[in-house]
Design a protein with these regions (language model features):
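Positively charged n-region of N-terminal signal peptides that target proteins for export
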Residues: 1-5
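Bacterial N-terminal signal peptides
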Residues: 7-15
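Edge beta-strand at a domain terminus
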Residues: 26-27, 81-85, 132, 136-162
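Sec/Tat signal peptide C-region and signal peptidase I cleavage site
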Residues: 16-22
Length: 162
């Protein structure tokens, strides 16, 4: 009996330790999370879409490690996408994701993509305080900017995204 209790305690500690570690490694494991807060800026080429930008940002991590931060404005989607394996530390405890694509869509479906160079800089939204997610990218023809400040509340796991 004592061995079983120890095994359960060890398993529980391991399980909770892994969950906490995943939170510390935002954007983390494959899936979709929603971050509440305020969209501070969203610009596509010369069009300023900030006024219609929603107070929710999606972070999508695919099984292959691709990470996309998706802004929504007036039913349209703008995603800043890069290889999560390329995330490096940045200043002030933030991290930096190099970008390779900007994706576009309507409703819940991404329908277009543009090759870009740029990056997203972000803090850990699980830290319990507001943090910024700021993305800038340039293609041959356009520039894209998205800036979002989280509320400080923990992100919410959504269905799908795998």
């Amino acid at each position: 009996m004592k061995l079983s209790a120890l095994a359960i305690a060890a398993f529980s500690t391991l399980a909770f330790g892994v969950a906490a570690e995943a939170d510390d490694n935002f954007p983390g494991a494959p899936g979709v999370i929603a971050l509440g807060g305020k969209c501070q800026k969203l610009v596509v080429a010369k069009f300023d879409a900030t006024k219609g930008c929603k107070g929710e940002l999606a972070s999508v991590t695919l099984v292959n490690g691709t990470v996309t931060f998706i802004f929504t404005s007036d039913g349209k989607l703008l995603g800043f996408q890069g290889d999560g394996k390329g995330i490096k530390p940045a200043s002030n405890g933030n991290a930096r994701l190099p970008l390779s694509l900007v994706t576009t869509g309507v409703g819940n479906k991404m329908t277009g993509e543009v090759k870009v160079a740029g990056f997203c800089t972000f803090g850990n939204p699980y830290a319990g305080k507001p943090t910024a997610i700021e993305c800038t990218a340039e293609s041959k023809d356009s520039a894209f900017t998205g800036s979002f400040r989280t509320s400080g509340k923990a992100p919410v796991q959504k269905n799908g995204g795998k």
